[in-house]
Swiss-Prot record:
Residues 1-25 are annotated as: Disordered. It comes from the Viruses. Residues 1-18 have a biased composition (Polar residues). This is Protein U52. Belongs to the herpesviridae UL79 family.
Length: 278
C-alpha cells in the first residue's frame, strides 16, 4: 500500500449547505446522498468495502481517505477534551482529576518536560514548591507546549485547541484521561501503521468505520430522523454499523470480510482491541 504523508486536517469546518430533495438521491432505507459528490463518494466507498487491499486504490483516493479519517479522529478527540473540561470545571482535587490516568502517562509528560524546560526532579515533584511549579508552567505556557509535544509523539500531529482549552490549567489532566479512550488508541494505531503493507488489514478495518462516519460528519450522507425513532434488531451492533449495513444492502455491495488473527498483531492489540470495529 502506498504510504501517504500525514495531512493536517483542520477541526474547524463550515456547516454543510442545506439541500432540497432534488439535490439528494436515496442510497439506503435511511440514507440520502448529495448528487454533486455522489459519483466520487460512491466510487471510493465501494472500493473500501470490495477491494482486497487499500493498496490497489489510487494515490488521490488514499489521500482523501486519510484526510477524512484524520478529521473524524481529531474532531472526536476535541469533543472528548471538551467533555473532560466541562466535567472538571472548578475542580482542583488532584485525586479526582487523576482518577483515570495511569502513572506511565505522567512519566512520559515528565520526559517531554525535561526536553524544553530545565528542571530537577526534587523541584518538580515537591509538594512545598507545587504552587511555584504551576505558576512557572503557566508563565512558560508549558501546559500547551507539553500537550502539543505529547500529541506529536503519539500521533504525529496535534489537535488545535480552542481558547477555553488552551487557558485551562487542567488541560494535561484532560489529555491524560482522553489517552485512555479507545478512540485515541485507535487513532494511534491508524497513524502508526498507515501505509505499512503487513498491517493493511488492521488499517482497512479502521478505515471502513471511520470513512463512513466522515461522510455523515461532512454532510454528504444524510441520515433520516426516523432511524432514531424505530427499533430494529440491527441496532444491537451500533447505529453506525446499522447505517453502514443499510447502505451496502441498498446499493447491492458485497463487502470482502477481513480476517484478523489477534496473535498475528500482538503490538496492535496491546494498544487496544479493534475487533469491535469489525
Amino acid at each position: 500500500m502506498t504510504r501517504v504523508s500525514s495531512v493536517s486536517a483542520s477541526c474547524t469546518t463550515t456547516n454543510p449547505p442545506k439541500n432540497t430533495r432534488e439535490d439528494m438521491s436515496r442510497v439506503g432505507a435511511h440514507l440520502t446522498i448529495q448528487n454533486d459528490f455522489r459519483h466520487l463518494i460512491m466510487q471510493i466507498t465501494e472500493k473500501i468495502f470490495t477491494k482486497s487491499s487499500l493498496g490497489s486504490m489510487k494515490f488521490e483516493e488514499l489521500k482523501i481517505i486519510h484526510m477524512g479519517c484524520q478529521t473524524v479522529f481529531m474532531r472526536g478527540i476535541l469533543t472528548l477534551l471538551t467533555r473532560e473540561c466541562f466535567w472538571n470545571t472548578g475542580n482542583d482535587d488532584i485525586r479526582i482529576l487523576n482518577r483515570n490516568i495511569p502513572t506511565s502517562y505522567w512519566l512520559e509528560i515528565h520526559t517531554l518536560l525535561e526536553k524544553f524546560i530545565p528542571t530537577t526532579d526534587p523541584w518538580i515533584f515537591s509538594d512545598v514548591y507545587a504552587e511555584n511549579t504551576l505558576q512557572y508552567l503557566q508563565k512558560q505556557n508549558a501546559c500547551v507546549r507539553l500537550y502539543q509535544e505529547y500529541m506529536l509523539s503519539k500521533l504525529g500531529l496535534y489537535v488545535p485547541l480552542p481558547d477555553f482549552l488552551r487557558e485551562d490549567v487542567n488541560i494535561l489532566f484532560h489529555l491524560g484521561t482522553v489517552t485512555q479512550h479507545r478512540l485515541f488508541k485507535t487513532f494511534m494505531i491508524f497513524q502508526k501503521y498507515w501505509g505499512i503493507d503487513s498491517y493493511e488489514p488492521i488499517v482497512r478495518t479502521i478505515v471502513r468505520k471511520t470513512w463512513f462516519f466522515f461522510l455523515i460528519l461532512w454532510g454528504q450522507l444524510r441520515v433520516d430522523s426516523n432511524v432514531f425513532c424505530e427499533q430494529d434488531f440491527g441496532h444491537e451492533a451500533g447505529i453506525l454499523s446499522y447505517l453502514q449495513s443499510d447502505y451496502l444492502s441498498f446499493m447491492g455491495i458485497g463487502q470482502i470480510d477481513i480476517s484478523i488473527n489477534k496473535s498475528s498483531f500482538p503490538d496492535v492489540f496491546s494498544i487496544t482491541d479493534i475487533k469491535p470495529l469489525m
